[in-house]
Amino acid sequence: MGLLERLRKEWFIVGIILVIAAAKLEPTVGVKGGPLKPEITITYIAVSAIFFNSGLSLKTEELTNALMHVKLHLFVQLFTLVFFPTAIWLFLQVLSLTPINEWLLKGLQTVSCMPPPVSSAVILTKAVGGNEAAAIFNSAFGSFLGIVVTPLLLLLFLGSSSSVPFTSIFSQLFMTVVVPLIIGQIVRRYIKDWLERKKPPFGAISSCVLLMIIYTTFCDTFSNPNIDLDTFSLVVIVFIIFFIQLAFMLLTFLFSTSKNSGFTPADTVAIVFCSTHKSLTLGIPMLKIVFVGYEHLSLISVPLLIYHPAQILLGSVLVPTIKSWMLSRQKALKLTRQPKIPL
């Protein structure tokens, strides 16, 4: 495979590197109040576009069937909002004995308390060909659940309390997730034949929107003068984040593929991504609300800012491997279910 062909195939990873570099060179473009106006273009337009796109591309019957998959939804929500933060808290009891910056460690705990993302898990599940409808439901449901659960978890593990405006966050999520999804489904009914004939690149469109989200996030990071990190702590945190993601992806994979799990290979794909991914678009505003007035807010935010692109990068790299496994597993299951021809 030639270099250009390889770059074309891995364009999303290349895009992540380029947008981070662009944010580093000129962060003022994508900061809040800057020319791109991310407080509008990202918070409302970008997230709405991702879910309108999903509503347009998803068959209604697939979305309806996903609502009934209670066992899968229960697994994902319990893993991401109960097991994840508890396991990280235990892990941090050991890490607190090391010279790693204590505020970065607190940041790791805040990452664990976040709900599933409203975009990346859906996009990666779609890229693999997994149960996209289940991923969408868990992303939306997890986000709404996170409005109440995440502040309570932060209070439990970090002792931070604040009057969180549940109503405004809930209404914002409803307008940017549920409404665009429904509108997308309605529009699909009228242009269904055209969509099936033309097959628009829905996955690529969502990925481009996600690159914009990453760009503005890093613009905020690089333009913040309060972030003062020692190289050792930063490198160790990056390593720990990748370790956590790989370990939890493997754990959810083993659980969901166990003999009596009852999950299909497509379900496993949605479970692996939805259970281990954490929301940045909901997480950063939530941290700003819960940790209002904290001088170390920027340091606490760093692990989440690293975790978000790391989960996309790692997920993108693993897409071909997971897709290959899913297809081979589906083929094997299909063969075992075929009736044997009597001799």
Curated annotation (Swiss-Prot):
Give tissue specificity per the record.
Strongly expressed in small intestine. Moderately expressed in spleen. Weakly expressed in skeletal muscle. Not detected in other tissues tested.
Q: Which UniProt keywords apply?
A: Cell membrane, Endoplasmic reticulum, Golgi apparatus, Ion transport, Membrane, Sodium, Sodium transport, Symport, Transmembrane, Transmembrane helix, Transport
GO CC term, one of those recorded: plasma membrane
Q: Name one GO biological process term.
A: sodium ion transport
Which regions face the Cytoplasmic side of the membrane?
Answer: 1-10, 59-71, 138, 185-201, 256-270, 320-343
Query: Would the keyword Transmembrane turn up in this protein's UniProt record?
Result: yes
**Which subcellular locations apply to this protein?**
Cell membrane; Endoplasmic reticulum membrane; Golgi apparatus membrane
A GO molecular function annotation here is: symporter activity
Name the family: Belongs to the bile acid:sodium symporter (BASS) (TC 2.A.28) family.
Q: What is this protein called?
A: Sodium/bile acid cotransporter 7-A
* Encoding gene, per UniProt annotation: slc10a7-a
